[in-house]
A protein has these predicted regions:
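Short acidic DE-rich linear segments
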Residues: 111-117
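Negatively charged, low-complexity tracts enriched in Asp/Glu with abundant Ser/Thr
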Residues: 2-58
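Detector for Asparagine
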Residues: 3, 8, 65-68, 86, ...
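Amphipathic protein-protein interaction modules
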Residues: 47-104
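Extended charged/polar low-complexity repeat regions
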Residues: 106-109
Length: 117
């Protein structure tokens, strides 16, 4: 399967965008923000997602600096923690297996990007 996401690079950082990923529902910029703000280089995120996919745990709740991810076997919902103060940032829903692929791609790119700085 060809990946439909893209990386946008700046001098000191990069982001992952999902404009062409039809399987991501809702505000796709929420997924972008979650990766950039909360996942960053934390490979443990993959372990939490794997545990849910493999049914080691029924679901998981990942609370970060600005986002909450509700990981379930089929779908994961990501919400901005301050939705009440900034209602323009809406939640998004991602198939959990796809989220695993996205997080892995993000972490690999993150490592390569900052290793080359």
């Amino acid at each position: 399967m060809e990946n439909k996401w893209k990386f946008n690079f700046r001098d000191d950082y990069f982001v992952m965008v999902f404009d062409e990923v039809k399987e991501v529902y809702g505000d796709k910029s929420t997924l972008t923000g979650w990766l950039f703000t909360d996942v960053r280089d934390f490979r443990g995120t993959l372990g939490y997602i794997d545990d849910v996919i493999s049914e080691k745990t029924k679901e998981d709740f990942l609370s970060g600096n600005a986002y909450n991810a509700y990981v379930k076997k089929d779908f994961t919902e990501i919400h901005f923690q301050f939705e009440d103060e900034n209602p323009s940032i809406k939640p998004c829903t991602v198939p959990t297996k796809l989220l695993h692929e996205i997080v892995k791609a993000w972490l690999d790119e993150y490592e390569e990007f900052y290793d080359n700085k």
